[in-house]
Amino acid sequence: MNDHIQPEGSAEHEHGALGDAEYAEFMELAAEEGFDIEDVEGAIDEAGHGPLPVLAVVGRPNVGKSTLVNRIIGRREAVVEDKPGVTRDRVTYEAEWAGRRFKLVDTGGWEQDVLGIDASVAAQAEYAIEAADAVVFVVDAKVGATDTDEAVVRLLRKAGKPVVLCANKVDGQSGEADASYLWALGLGEPHPVSALHGRGTGDMLDAVLEALPEAPAQSFGAAIGGPRRIALIGRPNVGKSSLLNKVAGEDRVVVNEIAGTTRDPVDELIELGGVTWKFVDTAGIRKRVHLQQGADYYASLRTAAAVEKAEVAVILIDASESISVQDQRIVTMAVDAGRAIVLAFNKWDTLDEERRYYLEREIETELLQVAWAPRVNVSARTGRHMEKLVPAIETALDGWETRVPTGRLNAFLGELVAAHPHPVRGGKQPRILFGTQAGTKPPRFVLFASGFIEHGYRRFIERRLREEFGFEGTPIHISVRVREKRGNKKK
């Protein structure tokens, strides 16, 4: 590793990853360059936050979950109705209320006809129990509590997670009377809400903030003690169970040729390379629903659960088959979640020279977004190259936790901008003035510029950051703040 960068071993400061002296010096520089101090503080706070607590929105179909999710995140994302046959690629979003950020999980994409309403809602609750720090349980106040609702209440109560009860579709006084009947569920005060019109959502979100911890229960890093957490993810039948068996040294996971037949075990503590690791269970992506309809959504929901609990995602890909859209979705999910990433290509021992040639071409085109991820070619069946897995995981975690000191970063940016200035656009040439790495896990940079920085130039900066400082195995987030003329606001 480069001698002027270091992994972050401790929790981040109140100024993101900047120490007090570093922060004071940086703010002085920002003031000299004419930036609004509040904007700069906000940018560092936004990029420098630690892991976000997770809030799951759970409820049976047609109670307004998706409408509520859209209301909370402040924009319309995807479908609003719970319709059979409608699924989403994405299930997690970042949200903010009263200055606090959290991750929001929309469980509304589950198709209600797959296993019947009871089983589908139970699957959502299962996710919430597994990965969320708090739960919003949405009930239709007009209909009242159903048997399905009662069943979910039992699951939630058993899990012991904080629950905020949302009585939706309350549009007036009569609706509030309907909502009051939901006290009988035993989950505390029902919050009367109209997700469609926004009525009551603010009060409900205030209650959510009281229920959510400041940081997630699955807090990152070795500082809290315990083994590092690995999510082994990938589409059904790529060999995840076989790989887990091989590294664990025993058949602790039931394996079948039918995709997704693994039963639900708990997280596995496994010793590899003299170190104990916690393999976060991904049974959901392997547990087939025995019906094609809805299985993909169920898989993505459970994969999201595993990724949320982990620090590094080992993405298993079947090297004997073409890289699929589903493989790419799983990769995107891990990147969007900001986890360290290792690519493991399974069934390598079955490939002939022609397939290896075409696989390399596929990797170059289909997995371009993770060209920075360490790669291992393995055989879960024979155990080939299993010893390469741990060094790849350690490399990815190392990159994920690396921080470049502000002084070193600005020296690098100064040299880069002088040698490769931004293209002139409309007679103007925007310049990057200075920047800082406000956070780690993954590395998050805030750059301050004199004008809008094009995406192509941002990609160039990321590429050069990787060349200079490593960051192997981790996504990098770069946000740019523009110095506006007096009287104008940022961006």
From Swiss-Prot:
Source taxon at top rank: Bacteria
Residues at which GTP 1 binds: 59-66, 106-110, 168-171
Domain EngA-type G per the UniProt entry, residue ranges: 53-216, 228-401
GO molecular function, one term: GTP binding
Residue ranges annotated for the KH-like domain, each copy included: 402-484
Pfam families: KH_dom-like, MMR_HSR1
Signal peptide span: none
Coiled-coil ranges (or none): none
Subunit relationships: Associates with the 50S ribosomal subunit.
Name of the featured protein: GTPase Der
Organism encoding this protein: Streptomyces avermitilis (strain ATCC 31267 / DSM 46492 / JCM 5070 / NBRC 14893 / NCIMB 12804 / NRRL 8165 / MA-4680)
